[in-house]
């Protein structure tokens, strides 16, 4: 296979992923027919409002869906040509935290208060790379220095409560990158951090990606972060993917009515928004317990047609690399 052909094969490809949870009220269809891919060395943004399924998608990729009450009901997660859903758990543990790592959403609570940050960083490299205690500690110091923590040789022995929120997030990034993963999943990596620290964390992720070639899945609701950090963006609504494409194309020419509304709601994202009242998307997100046929956004969409409420729209390519699930677009370029 040529280098060009190899570059065209996605590092990660998700096909038809479905996830459901059993609740007291019934079955919640949390993810339905999720399709996405990530190329080597690129950053894909995954956006949508709270509860749309972004974090569940990340947990599914890591095979960390709690069972019960949740379960993966359908689909494939192809990583480097291998379906992760078919791997025995022992083999999946060799991938998780090693070749695919994750920065979890809450830096203030994601670290174990009973162990030093050095112990928590060295755990993964000793497990996956077979380093002894001395070499593992040296790697921990190296990673703390790489993420910009000063006096790393001393601080590697300190505990999470001795670090600020921004520094804890840097520790989380150091842990995630310690094994030099192929993919880094960053789930709202700047949650609860002030604006200055947010910018530092994004700069750090971008710099580490450029130096190591790691692909990044950036989960966020911040359209500014998407514009600054990502090559492509995928938009989710109520457990379904509604639009995907190059970031500059989607932000400048959004096709799905939900994407249009999401961008219009972001202060300053739309040129027409300056000096105008903030816009909102009318209505509420549909219950995941009451799935019906059709587009999940139909009841909130000003452009809805009768078939929008009865038939799920196909995935249609509106131009190269840009697809949308909406009946407003011709059906001639449907994705097989």
What are these regions (language model features)?
Residues 72-83:
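Conserved ABC transporter NBD signature motif
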Residues 84-101, 119, 127, 249-254, ...:
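ABC ATPase NBD coupling module
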Residues 178-182:
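A short, proline-enriched helix->beta-strand linker immediately N-terminal to the Walker B motif
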């Amino acid at each position: 296979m040529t280098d060009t052909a190899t570059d065209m094969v996605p590092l990660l490809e998700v096909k038809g992923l479905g996830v459901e949870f059993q609740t007291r009220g019934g079955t919640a269809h949390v993810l339905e027919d999720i399709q996405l891919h990530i190329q080597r060395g690129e950053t894909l943004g995954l956006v949508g409002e709270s509860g749309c399924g972004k974090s569940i998608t990340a947990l599914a990729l890591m095979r960390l869906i709690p069972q019960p009450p949740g379960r993966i009901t359908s689909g494939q997660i192809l990583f480097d040509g291998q379906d992760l859903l078919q791997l025995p758990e022992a083999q999946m543990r060799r991938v998780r935290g090693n070749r695919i790592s994750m920065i979890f959403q809450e830096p203030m609570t994601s670290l174990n208060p009973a162990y030093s940050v050095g112990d928590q960083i060295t755990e993964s490299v000793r497990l996956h790379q077979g380093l002894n205690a001395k070499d593992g500690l040296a790697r921990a110091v190296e990673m703390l220095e790489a993420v910009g923590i000063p006096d790393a040789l001393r601080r590697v022995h300190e505990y999470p409560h001795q670090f600020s929120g921004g520094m804890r997030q840097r520790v989380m990034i150091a842990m995630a990158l310690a094994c030099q993963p192929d993919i880094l999943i960053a789930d709202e990596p700047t949650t609860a951090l002030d604006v200055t620290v947010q910018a530092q964390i994004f700069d750090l992720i971008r710099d580490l990606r450029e130096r190591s070639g790691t692909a990044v899945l950036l989960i966020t609701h911040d359209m500014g972060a998407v514009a600054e950090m990502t090559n492509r963006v995928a938009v989710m609504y109520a457990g379904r993917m509604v639009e995907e494409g190059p970031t500059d194309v989607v932000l400048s020419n959004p096709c799905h009515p939900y994407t249009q509304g999401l961008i219009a709601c972001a202060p300053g994202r739309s040129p027409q928004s300056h000096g105008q009242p903030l816009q909102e998307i009318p209505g509420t997100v549909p219950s995941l317990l009451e799935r019906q046929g059709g587009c999940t956004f139909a009841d909130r969409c000003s452009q809805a047609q009768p078939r929008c409420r009865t038939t799920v729209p196909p995935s249609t390519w509106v131009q190269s690399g840009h697809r949308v699930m909406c009946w407003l677009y011709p059906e001639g370029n449907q994705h097989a």
